Amino acid sequence: MTDSMADSKTDSKTDDMTGATAPLVQLERYTRFWNTGPDGDRDRLAATVFTDEVEYRALVGLLRGPAALADFRDRFVSHAGPATVRRREEPEVHHGRARLRWEILTGDGTSFATGTDVIEFAGDGRISGIAAFLDRAPEGFDPTAHD
């Protein structure tokens, strides 16, 4: 992280006026959520990252609530094996939204897929909505199989 980024208001832990968690902090937690299995501290992490009504919209469908996102992650890992989500670049944030470009790496470090999440923040700084787009789909992925 550059010094200028460390000094920016968006990198502080909370907004002094509202007490809301800063977007870049939440995006770091968001990435950590996708990399935390059921044996980790995922429920506590989810409560700090997501609103109770968070909506996740992707080609695979519409998911509602942190438990549905955790289940989606667990089903993916049970099917594909160990996987890690990493950010491809620094997220862009403005007007209560963020664009986060990600990559999923398999257990051996092979790139599985890349994508972009457009994330909406609630007034308290937690994530209330995610629209997930595939930039490079996994090999053999059929987008019509999830209609």
What do the predicted segments below correspond to?
Residues 24, 43-96:
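A solvent-exposed, acidic/Ser-Thr-rich amphipathic alpha-helical stretch
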Residues 27-34, 50, 73-76, 100-102, ...:
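Hydrophobic alpha-helical core bundles mediating ligand binding, dimerization, or RNAP-core interactions
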Residues 2-3, 15-18, 77-147:
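A beta-strand edge to alpha-helix "cap/lid" segment located at domain peripheries
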Residues 30, 45-46, 54, 65, ...:
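Hydrophobic pocket/interface hotspot
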Residues 36, 59, 117:
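Short, flexible active-site loop motifs that bind/organize anionic cofactors or intermediates
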Residues 17-49:
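Short acidic-aromatic low-complexity motifs
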